[in-house]
Amino acid sequence: AASDVYKRQMPYTATRDIPYDSDAAAIFDALAQPHDSLLLESADIETKKNLNCLAVLKAALKVTCHGQRVEVRALTEAGESLLPSLEERFHHRLVSRETTTAVFEFSLSTHPDERERLLAESTADILRFLQLEANYSSPLLPFLGGGFAYDYLATFEELPEVKPGANTYPDFEFLVAQTVLAVDHLQGTAHLEGWDIDDKRLREELDSLASLPAAARPAAPQKEKIRAVADVDDAGFRADVDKLKGNIHAGDIYQVVPARAFTVECPNALAAYRALRETNPSPYMFYVRGADYELFGASPESNLKFAPKDRQVQLYPCLLYTSDA
């Protein structure tokens, strides 16, 4: 019965052209939802010119994975319409179902062959289904945007337990887009694409978004000194590096990336992302606005620059995470 209801609510798709703005972040700032939205941008490393942008302005679903458990939460009525088919496909994994949420539990494969373990049904199949089996489509939709944590590997392999840290980002969290923004800087164009189970509501919403002006440019940041606090002091980090060099010499490992975390005050993460974009334009730049966190970064990043003339060293962050906690 649930799948019959789902099939009766066939989604509609629509597009709208909107005024172009060379600062895609300004359009995003004006049009995107205050939570559960994301901005992806690309720039040429050599010329530093912006190339294109893709942003999730509104999400229908939020998919969050902790270990072997995946929670799919509907953020809109359109998102609710996707839950029955998901429930039908993964009924053998379903452990909880409410009006706006469905929770699925998977298990770690114990097959002796590594390839078979990777091919076994896993939490990632939820994402694959939402991307590949959607009953709506447009040039950009369906679209899922989000991120994987390093610890997600532990859902495929048995690894030593890692102590909880200050970073509470889940194993993965993805948004299933309902309204997206696309900006082509080379052509000087921008447009919206969206889907919904109510055609009239969809078109009215796109018309409303298309009529909104872009957000005002932020004031130039004040060049004040900020204090960064490291989780490992300089002496401790040097000791870690010396120990790892010994491990390489002994043949225990052949490659390693020692790292430490720095904490700074970040009252405006979107402004900080814009500053990073200005100083380090990259092919892959991202700003993610979750329910209780913001995540941004650039890749490939200029991690370290050395000027031999004045012997100045500059460090650049590759990923920044802010939390309301």
What are the functions of these language-model segments?
Residues 3, 7-323:
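Extended alpha-helical targeting/anchoring segments
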